[in-house]
């Protein structure tokens, strides 16, 4: 009993949800045109990242189902919907107002909720997520969930910099935004991949040089996963 309690305490300590009841505030408060404008600015500020992903998406074969984690107001399924002309797209976002915008402007499937906690019964040929892991309360659980719900491919980006020597994830809570601003540890996520059964030849972690005009982070992290069985 004592050992189980200690394990639970360590688990809570190593995530960031405990005590932060305003988690997700920055995404929940915006609505309508203001919300669309905000997501469009975010998308435009990561052009190189998105270009890399689009090229990656176009070279994947036999994709029938795709899941986007953190779809926002739907830049991909609405403005870039031609990418999914022959694919069943599903988008997930924690913001109820963002998902309302998606459903209003697209016939694709959309789900609202905390991806880490959502019960997702089906698996997808490709799961991708842009600049979401930088803000979640449990980075390992977030990435592990993506690995779990993909049949074959996953593409994950972290935009706050490339930290090859960082031994553990670094989490910084911003109370005004109701969000974390995380530094993503490549060393720690490699350990997590091994723990959940991914072989070294099934994932690739690289730095992507970007033109961050308003940020000091000139490099971003791109994780590409391809399951072999």
PLM region spans:
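Conserved class I S-adenosyl-L-methionine
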Residues: 1-58, 63-72, 155-183
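Short catalytic micro-motifs in class I SAM-dependent methyltransferases
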Residues: 131-135
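Short alpha-helix
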Residues: 179-197
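A short glycine-rich, Lys/Arg-flanked "PGG" loop and its adjoining helix->strand segment in the class I
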Residues: 141-154
């Amino acid at each position: 009993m004592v050992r189980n309690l200690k394990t639970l305490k360590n688990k809570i300590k190593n995530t960031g949800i405990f005590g932060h009841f305003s988690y997700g505030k920055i995404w929940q408060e915006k609505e309508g045109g203001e919300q669309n404008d905000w997501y469009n600015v975010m998308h435009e500020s990561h052009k190189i990242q998105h270009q890399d992903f689009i090229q990656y998406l176009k070279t994947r074969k036999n994709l029938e189902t795709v899941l986007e984690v953190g779809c926002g107001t739907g830049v991909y399924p609405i403005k870039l919907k031609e990418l999914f002309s022959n694919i069943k797209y599903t988008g997930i976002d924690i913001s109820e107002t963002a998902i309302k915008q998606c459903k209003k402007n697209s016939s694709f499937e959309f789900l609202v909720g905390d991806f880490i906690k959502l019960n997702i019964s089906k698996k997808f040929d490709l799961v991708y997520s842009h600049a979401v892991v930088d803000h979640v309360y449990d980075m390992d659980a977030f990435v592990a969930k993506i690995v779990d719900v993909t049949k074959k491919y996953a593409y994950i980006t972290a935009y706050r910099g490339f930290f090859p020597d960082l031994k553990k994830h670094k989490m910084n809570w911003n109370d005004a935004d109701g969000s974390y601003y995380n530094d993503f540890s490549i060393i720690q996520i490699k350990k997590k991949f091994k723990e959940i059964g991914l072989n070294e030849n099934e994932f690739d972690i690289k730095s992507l040089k970007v033109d961050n005009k308003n940020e000091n982070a000139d490099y971003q992290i791109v994780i590409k996963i391809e399951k072999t069985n």
